[in-house]
Amino acid sequence: DVDKLEPSEEFMEKFAPQYKAVNDFVSEKVGTFTESIATRPAYFGPSAFIDFIHSLQLELTGADVSFAAPLSFDAKIDKGDITISDMFSLYKYENMLYTMNLTGAEIKGFLEESYAMWTNRMKSPDDHLLLLKERKKGQENYASFVNFSFNFDSAAGIIYTVDVTKPKGEKITILKMADGKPFDENKTYKVALNSYRGNGGGELLTKGAGIPQDELKSRIIHSTDKDLRYYMIQYIKEKGVLSPQPLNQWQMIPQDWTRLAAERDCKFLFGE
C-alpha cells in the first residue's frame, strides 16, 4: 500500500515549489454559486448542472441549439466560493467547442440515438426509466448504466418531449424552438457541441443523425482556440455571482409513469 510509505524528504523538498504552484492554482477562487449543482438530476430531466453548460455554449457561439452531457457520473459542486478545482468537476475533459450545421431531421436523429442509449422503453409503470444493468450476485451494492453516461446528450434551444414508452426513432417530439418559433426538420440550424461529439464520439452524429464520418469536418463552422473549461472559468469570473437554474426545455413523458420511476431509479443508482 503506497499510502503507508514514508515520502522521500529530498523529493518533497525538490518539488515543493511546483507542488505549491499547482495547489495555489487549483485553489484560486473563480466566483460564487448561490445554489449547489449536481449531475444526478441530469439523468431524469433538465438540470442546473447541464443547463449551465448549455447556456454557456449558446452564449459563446450564438448557435440555435446546444448539445451537452454529464461528463462525470456523479459530480457535485456545493454552493459558495467556486475554485479552479471545482471547474474540473464541472467539465473534466479538454474539449474544444464546435459550432456545426445540422438539419432539423439530423437534430432529431441525434437525440433519438442519445435517449435510446439512456432511457429504457417502459412497458409498465413499474419498469426502470433508465437503461440500467441489473445487479449481479455478489455486487448488490453496485449499480450502473448499460452505456456510458458521458454520451447522454440533452439539448437546449428547443422544446421537446421524450416518450419513454416508445421505441427508438419515435421517442423524441420537438415541439418548437425555445424562442417560440416553429421547428423545421428541413431547415439547417447552427448547433453548439463539444469537439469529442463533433468528431463523431459516441456515434450520435454518425449512427444517430446519419452523417457519414468523413462528412463531419465539412459541417464544422467554427472551433474555439481554447478548451471549454477555459471559457467557463472566464465566464464565471466575469459574472462573479451566479445562480444556476434548470432551463426546463424538455421532459420525459408520460409523467405519471416517469415521476415515480425516476425516484426508484435514483435510489437504485445512488442508494439514496
Identify what each model region corresponds to.
Residues 1-272:
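Catalytic centers of hydrolytic enzymes
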